[in-house]
Amino acid sequence: MPVLFSSRSLILSIIVPLLISIALYKLDTFDPAIVPSDAFTSSATSLPPLINDEFLTGAEFIGVGLLNIPEDIAYHKESNLIYTGCVDGWVKRVKVADSVNDSVVEDWVNTGGRPLGIAFGIHGEVIVADVHKGLLNISGDGKKTELLTDEADGVKFKLTDAVTVADNGVLYFTDASYKYTLNQLSLDMLEGKPFGRLLSFDPTTRVTKVLLKDLYFANGITISPDQTHLIFCETPMKRCSKYYISEERVEVFTQSLPGYPDNIRYDGDGHYWIALPSGVTTLWNISLKYPFLRKLTAMVAKYGVDLMFMENAGVLQVDLDGNPIAYYHDPKLSHIATCDKIGKYLYCGSLSQSHILRLDLLKYPAQNKKL
């Protein structure tokens, strides 16, 4: 009899939780989509000829403890200041120096939100893509903050992400997702549906236009040196695309990246630098193919357990045609959000750290690993 009771208890201990799990799965309204086949390009990933796979070996840390998750950075050459937005709402200014110990961090303006993308307007103003507020204009050396726009076509921005400024003053920016907020970022990725938009704001007419919609987490953006097109990143698709401004058409700029792109910067010297918060992971590749796995992951994420691990972050350098030139990464590195080449240094913002990373490209260059 005790044996029978023990066997029955064992069966119940397995069946009951299983039935409960099935019921919870069925009742959960999260409905991930089948991801387009061009997302499955990991096997076709081609690495550039030059590689530095020990990024952290030469990395220096700027503003340790004074910069609370500095996601994006923008360099103002005339003042030798880096502007960066932090998770506590502060746009901070960092005086850069040859020695990281001589760098000075200043609390400049608090937006009352979460500043992400940062760029400079044609009149010296600072343009901020604030994830909670919308597109902001900070002028008068920080004395005036103005909301430029927070909606388009009657749809409020949920995740104002990155911004770039054309020579004629027009602002181009991304709303990564009109459905999910920054804190729900993983749910946007897991659902596998295109909620992102590419937009423009004309300061003269005050008109906000939707240039493209149905993008997969529209992230970083920059304008080409000849001002003819934009380059924007779609993170889960591992690609960056061109949008021709006058022709209003799109084509792939670079794809099959070795990681998931965040921000992109032009260095003024014929190259773009693409930040990769994480390298390609096997778990994510498998999840992309099977919506039910993404639903399970999302259900777990709602209880505060994030299974979307980020690892082997880095920076990819490409030429004006999108051809990979050099790849700087490290298996121990994660959450690189942006990168800006300033002189001989590469400066990187982060999605998780309390500092800006700096790498001396002359001392720690990418090298030909095939030699």
Curated annotation (Swiss-Prot):
What coarse category fits the chief subcellular location reported for this protein? other
Residue numbers of Phosphotyrosine PTMs: Y303
**What is the induction note for this entry?**
By salicylic acid (SA), jasmonic acid (MJ), ethylene (ET), wounding, and infection with the fungal pathogen A.brassicicola and cucumber mosaic virus (CMV), both in local and systemic tissues.
Pfam families recorded: SSL_N, Str_synth
Stretch forming the signal peptide = 1-25
Q: In which compartments does the protein localize?
A: Vacuole
| GO BP terms in the entry | response to ethylene; response to fungus; response to jasmonic acid; response to salicylic acid; response to virus; response to wounding
* GO (cellular component) term, any one: vacuole
In this protein, the residues bearing a glycan are: N101, N137, N285
**Superkingdom, natural source:** Eukaryota
Matching entries from InterPro entries are given as:
6-blade_b-propeller_TolB-like, Strictosidine_synth_cons-reg
Could you list this entry's UniProt keywords, alphabetically sorted: Glycoprotein, Phosphoprotein, Signal, Vacuole
Homology family: Belongs to the strictosidine synthase family.
Q: Please give the name of this protein.
A: Protein STRICTOSIDINE SYNTHASE-LIKE 7
Gene source species: Arabidopsis thaliana
Name the encoding gene, please. SSL7
